């Protein structure tokens, strides 16, 4: 369920609620459900520019408690249309993920998750109405569990169409 409401001509608020279920044939310990509640406040100071701040709550329930968790996330970002048809979007996020139970090593996992992303595209470049965008994403997870701390860099091509 997604709801978007314009507070006035410059401010918009969006809320999303999701419910899902996972069922696995072989890894039945991961069977369960998940919930997401997401809120975003966007500010459009002028044409071609926007800022946003958001907060999310995600809960994953599984049969085994060492795979079940709660995740609280804060995000902020900025989008800008530049000259020559270039557009960019920059976002930063911090999340705290806390697992419900201890694993085989008797460690109850607690993660601090950091993420940044930069997206670049040309507004006049599209194919059949689909605009390609290139994104660089960096993620760092700092965990109290030695097996789950990592850094990840990704570059990917995103294809999008606005209706």
PLM region descriptions:
Residues 1-163:
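Gram-negative and organellar
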